[in-house]
Amino acid sequence: LTGPASPVPVHSRESLTVRCSYQTGFETHKKYWCKGGFWKNCDIVIKTSGTEGETTSGRFSIRDEQTQQTFSVTMTGVTQEDEDTYFCGVERFWTADDMYEIKVTVLPGKVHIGEIHSDSPMLTKHHLQFLLMWGYPKALYL
């Protein structure tokens, strides 16, 4: 089982998609995304049914692409609390699951600047610019 090099950075409030690849012969085995600490006691966040396709649960989705022997996990609306050690996992019979460790680091949210124009005489004189920083808009008159 392989995946991306750690750590995997993501900005707060954005989405993260991680792709893991598994060996031939494990196509119909269940795949999962597990959060926390050590592989033996991590919490399974989302799991496939063992068939090809996508499963969604809250902010998490997992898609098994069996013909390509890969599965991808997407986490939306990432917050600082999502920063942790995760594992891509493939269930195996009669032995320990195959797992790949990935450290996810959450970076501060990006700054987005946009400009709004209006037909209002008041706003045509003063373009209203919004600064979105840390998720809170602040209006500035220019």
Can you name each region flagged by the protein language model?
Residues G3-P7:
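Surface-exposed, proline-enriched loop/turn segments that connect beta strands in immunoglobulin-like
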Residues L1, K40-N41, Q68-T70, Q80-E81, ...:
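Short loop/beta submotifs within extracellular cysteine-rich repeat domains
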Residues V10-T17, F26-T28, Q66-T70, G77-C88:
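Solvent-exposed loop/turn motifs of extracellular immunoglobulin-like beta-sandwich domains
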Residues R13, S21-Q23, G36, R63, ...:
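Structured beta-strand/turn binding interfaces of compact recognition modules in eukaryotic regulators
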Residues W33, S72-V73:
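Short, structured motif recognition centered on aromatic/hydrophobic residues
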Residues E81, T85-V111:
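Extracellular/luminal immunoglobulin-like beta-sandwich modules
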Residues T24-R59:
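N-terminal V-set
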